[in-house]
Amino acid sequence: MVEDSIGNETVNQESTYSLPFWCTKGTKLRDFQFKLLHTRRITSNDFLYKIGIKQSNSCTFCGEATENLVYLFWSCKHSNAFWKDCYQWIMQNTSKIENFNLSEALLFGLINNAKDLLRHHLLLIARHYIYTCKQRDTRPNVRMYIHIVQRTVKIERQIAKGHNSLDTFKKKSPRLKTSPF
């Protein structure tokens, strides 16, 4: 088992790279997480500015600082507010999710264990949503995120039905109180 430390947290690399395959059947989310972990595949304005594609290296959401991946996904006041709203929604609308602390490592999918696949799935959807907002030049908001979660759950249910794994799906998704079924 390969482990690294980020801040005060220990990261299990094997679990980190396997996590998207455990928590979702959606290839779009799996692909996104893989690209995020290989930082040059998910680009920030800082990188795009350096190679001459963008006119500015400023944050897409606030325009107040240089946009690198940590700033985009964590430090920007708009991303940070979204994460707080997202956390509150997750805690209010799921059952059996232990209280957890928002941290850079967790929000990037860098984990020391994969105990709660529903939580990791919801955070993966949130990461992908933030990046989609960057691409569309819009700010993330929790109402749209909730809509995306509901749509994703419907898709995951259809995939589970097609693969005769509905029982496994039902163990995870009914814990989501806003489940669309």
Task: Give the location of each predicted region.
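Family-specific functional microsites
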Residues: 2-181
